[in-house]
């Protein structure tokens, strides 16, 4: 199987294609990307027949910015008979996947696919039963086995394949299903909530998002991101010239600092988190984030980079390379991840976790 399907935000197919071509090439897995504008997915076709599986095994999914999900597939199944779509799909998967741990019948995230998604939901139950009978799926769901994907691009037309549970998105279609809290000051709160789900393993939440931590929110008004930190019982310094929502101030956990986020300097030495969603040029935001991390002013940060209209992948790559270079130059070991989240628009979200430094900061992990 030499094709890899990558799901992405509609309108960002070129960025997704540029990224997978670049990162696959660096691992000497060569091929070309098939791109259809606003399709919500890209197909990377490897030149060597077994390189599809090699790519989804060797390249960490967490290193991809513009892909929401990926899986290796075979040839396109077309003209599935309406009276029996199941038999051809089972036939395609037999001998390819054995004892898969989960089935996902998916579509691209486009308006055109909404009707198709209704069919996928109904189709999943009988297909799952047939795949279990054929030995393609285990009799129970397990995260220890590959995930079987059936990806419909049109009625009666699908790709079939699989991904590895340890190197994919755990979410259906790569999208966490989050509900907007009615008491949140703005919808931007969902960006930070999704980022926490994507970047921080669930079993580490109690330690890394603990009660009583101190956090800073730069460019906080009206408080969408502060809301998430308050909900996790943190003490938050919200920095913005604009006012904060009164509901947040009433919690007693928020200190509003009427300052410019770029000029603010923390006066505590025990800040665990700094978050930032300011509308500013990516280079300026990245330089500020580097300053915070190099100086050890926080242990972890999540921030957004607003994207230009053109050369978006190149712009993000350039800024992440600058950030890495600054950390390296100052002897800071950190883990950097970036992703265009479902709730992001013309932007990407970056997470950096400072692990240790040659010159000790106050929030280093030893």
From Swiss-Prot:
Q: What is its EC number?
A: 2.1.1.186
- Which positions are tagged coiled coil? none
Q: Which reaction does it catalyse?
A: cytidine(2498) in 23S rRNA + S-adenosyl-L-methionine = 2'-O-methylcytidine(2498) in 23S rRNA + S-adenosyl-L-homocysteine + H(+)
**What EC class does the entry list?**
transferase
Q: Where in the cell is it found?
A: Cytoplasm
Gene Ontology cellular component terms for the protein in this record: cytoplasm
The answer to whether the entry has keyword Methyltransferase is yes
> What GO terms describe the biological role, i.e. biological process, of this protein?
methylation; rRNA processing
Entries under SUPFAM superfamilies matching the protein: S-adenosyl-L-methionine-dependent methyltransferases
Q: Report the active site residues.
A: 306
Chain sites annotated for binding S-adenosyl-L-methionine: 188, 221-224, 240, 260, 277
* GO MF term set: S-adenosylmethionine-dependent methyltransferase activity
Regions crossing the membrane? none
Keywords of the record = Cytoplasm, Methyltransferase, rRNA processing, S-adenosyl-L-methionine, Transferase
* UniProt cross-references to InterPro entries, sorted A to Z: RlmM_FDX, RlmM_THUMP-like, RNA_MeTrfase_FtsJ_dom, rRNA_MeTrfase_M, SAM-dependent_MTases_sf
Instruction: Indicate the principal place this protein occupies in or around the cell.
Output: cytoplasm
Q: Does the keyword Iron apply?
A: no
* A Pfam family it matches: RLMM_N
**Highest taxon above the source species:** Bacteria
Q: Which family does it belong to?
A: Belongs to the class I-like SAM-binding methyltransferase superfamily. RNA methyltransferase RlmE family. RlmM subfamily.
Q: How does it assemble?
A: Monomer.
Q: What does this protein do?
A: Catalyzes the 2'-O-methylation at nucleotide C2498 in 23S rRNA.
Q: What is this protein called?
A: Ribosomal RNA large subunit methyltransferase M
């Amino acid at each position: 199987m030499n094709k890899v399907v990558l799901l992405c935000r509609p309108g960002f197919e070129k960025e997704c294609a540029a990224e997978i071509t670049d990162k696959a090439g660096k691992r000497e897995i060569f091929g070309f990307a098939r791109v259809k504008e606003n399709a919500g997915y890209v197909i990377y076709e490897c030149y060597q027949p077994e390189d599809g599986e090699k790519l989804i095994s060797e390249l960490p999914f967490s290193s991809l910015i513009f892909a929401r999900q990926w899986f290796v597939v075979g040839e396109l199944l077309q003209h599935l008979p309406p009276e029996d779509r199941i038999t051809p799909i089972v036939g395609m998967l037999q001998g390819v996947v054995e004892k898969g741990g989960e089935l996902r019948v998916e579509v691209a995230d486009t308006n055109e696919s909404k009707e198709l998604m209704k069919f996928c939901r109904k189709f999943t139950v009988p297909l799952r039963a047939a795949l279990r009978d054929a030995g393609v799926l285990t009799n129970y769901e397990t995260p220890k086995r590959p995930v079987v994907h059936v990806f419909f691009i049109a009625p009666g037309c699908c790709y079939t394949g699989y991904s590895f549970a340890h190197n994919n998105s755990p979410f259906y279609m790569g999208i966490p299903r989050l509900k907007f809290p009615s008491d949140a000051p703005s919808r931007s709160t969902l960006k930070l909530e999704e980022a926490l789900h994507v970047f921080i393993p669930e079993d580490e939440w109690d330690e890394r998002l603990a009660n009583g931590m101190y956090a800073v929110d730069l460019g906080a008004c009206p408080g969408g991101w502060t809301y998430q930190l308050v909900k996790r019982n943190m003490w938050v310094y919200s920095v913005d010239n604009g006012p904060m929502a009164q509901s947040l101030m009433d919690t007693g956990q928020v200190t509003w600092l009427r300052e410019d986020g770029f000029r603010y300097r923390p006066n505590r030495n025990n800040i665990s988190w700094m978050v930032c969603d300011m509308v500013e040029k990516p280079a300026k935001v990245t330089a500020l984030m580097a300053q915070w991390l190099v100086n050890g002013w926080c242990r972890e940060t999540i921030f957004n980079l607003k994207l230009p209209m053109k050369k978006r992948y190149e712009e993000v790559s350039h800024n992440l390379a600058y950030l890495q270079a600054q950390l390296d130059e100052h002897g800071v070991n950190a883990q950097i991840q970036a992703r265009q989240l479902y709730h992001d628009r013309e932007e990407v979200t970056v997470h950096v976790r400072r692990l240790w430094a040659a010159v000790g900061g106050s929030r280093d992990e030893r």
